[in-house]
Amino acid sequence: MKKIEMYHHKKVLVLGLARSGVSAATIMHKLGAFVTVNDQKPFSENPEAQGLLEQGIKVICGSHPIELLDEGFELVIKNPGIPYNNPMIEKALKLKIPVITEVELAYQISEAPIVGITGTNGKTTTTTIIHHMLNAHKENSSLLAGNIGFPASAVAENATSDQYISMELSSFQLMGVQTFKPHISVITNIYEAHLDYHTDRSEYVQAKWHIQQNQTADDFLVINWDQEELKNLTKQTKAQVIPFSTTQRLEQGSYVQNGNIMFDDEVIGSRDSILLPGEHNLENILASVAVAKTLGVTNEEIMYVLETFKGVEHRTQFVVEWQGRKFYNDSKATNILATQSALKGFKNPVVLLAGGLDRGNSFDELLPFFKNVKSLIVFGETADKIGRVGKIAGIEVHYVDDVEAAVPVAYRESAPGDIILLSPACASWDQYRTFEVRGNAYMDAISELIEEVEK
């Protein structure tokens, strides 16, 4: 970790505990700052709070007292999930107190260069593939950070200059960056999402675009050339642009030609030998190849990863084949586009489990993708909205309380050869703490179903 002096004896407020807040508070304390942590949940729901108190860090739990900001803080580090229209954040900005997220701190202390990956969909899978490719190369090693793995600042604290940090970044994290500068930035794609957090689509796009705002001509921007919006934005960057495309041959960058994965004019390997299923994963693969080639990973090392990588948990994850039915867990599908992508990947009839937090979407965009859906099982706040679209498509719709209740209904409505797919098209927070918890609940329910039927 770089021993920076800029926070020594500075008063710092960390808003929100969770993993990133604990990491930021601990590191700031080590850097000599006077740290206060504030979380809305009570002490009884914050097991990390006691550990911070034992380090000598002040902790206030149970509410966000607005008067706390009158205590002369010189910096606020906010949890990414706290929106900028939160009264605490609005007051901090009014008082001209800088507000950052934990990834900014990670960059400031990191000795290792950062490969930062963002996008509406595919960023977790892309980050993971890049991580594996860099670790497959004898001269590189990678640490996984950000929304996947460990908090960015915790990873940066222990990273060395001969490593890379493969860092997944959300728009929530990027919106507040000031000096953050990855050596390589990746934007997988941009679609409409998180409009409950951002004021409009323009703000969302700009938050994603912040990933490259401090890059120079010595840095690289890997970007989806199939999206005109992103293509046009590249005119504004100082970084070297490396495009990727699933639809066209490129003079430089990564693309597909004659069944082969290409980079510039070089054949990397056959697409048929790639283990990861689904058309939607091709973007992720091409973006990863562009990063790997830029950092000197060989074709053999790249293909070894692509021939062995089975995917990431909760992302179109194959769970089990039982009684002729294949169960898939796509709990990470927290928006409509992700569910569209999942449905496109299956040719067999699908029993779809969907629903979750209501962010104001109509779900009409799912209609063209329901051709292979034979039965729809809905739950959560959006059950009625998604169910309405299913009825328009002429699909039989079943309403249940939650994911656990959906599994036996899905089995009853399916037949040998069918796909049973959890792909909610919604965030989990109306019923489950995270999409991982929701996905695990689904897989546990499958295990219970099998045990019950086979008694």
Swiss-Prot record:
Give me the residues that bind ATP, please.
Answer: G119, T120, N121, G122, K123, T124, T125
Annotated compartments = Cytoplasm
State one molecular function term (GO): tetrahydrofolylpolyglutamate synthase activity
UniProt-listed GO biological process terms: cell division; cell wall organization; peptidoglycan biosynthetic process; regulation of cell shape
Q: What class of enzyme is it?
A: ligase
The catalytic activity of this protein is classed by the Enzyme Commission as 6.3.2.9
Extract the SUPFAM superfamilies matched here: MurCD N-terminal domain (SSF51984), MurD-like peptide ligases, catalytic domain (SSF53623), MurD-like peptide ligases, peptide-binding domain (SSF53244)
Which top-level group of life is the source organism from? Bacteria
- InterPro entries registered for this protein in UniProt: Folylpolyglutamate_synth_CS, Mur-like_cat_sf, Mur_ligase_C, Mur_ligase_C_dom_sf, Mur_ligase_cen, MurD
Q: State the reactions this protein catalyses.
A: UDP-N-acetyl-alpha-D-muramoyl-L-alanine + D-glutamate + ATP = UDP-N-acetyl-alpha-D-muramoyl-L-alanyl-D-glutamate + ADP + phosphate + H(+)
Q: Which UniProt keywords apply?
A: ATP-binding, Cell cycle, Cell division, Cell shape, Cell wall biogenesis/degradation, Cytoplasm, Ligase, Nucleotide-binding, Peptidoglycan synthesis
One GO term of the cellular component aspect? cytoplasm
Pathway, per Swiss-Prot/TrEMBL? Cell wall biogenesis; peptidoglycan biosynthesis
Quote the function comment for this protein: Cell wall formation. Catalyzes the addition of glutamate to the nucleotide precursor UDP-N-acetylmuramoyl-L-alanine (UMA).
Family (UniProt): Belongs to the MurCDEF family.
User: Which PANTHER family does this UniProt record tie to the protein?
Assistant: UDP-N-ACETYLMURAMOYLALANINE--D-GLUTAMATE LIGASE
Name of the protein in its database record: UDP-N-acetylmuramoylalanine--D-glutamate ligase
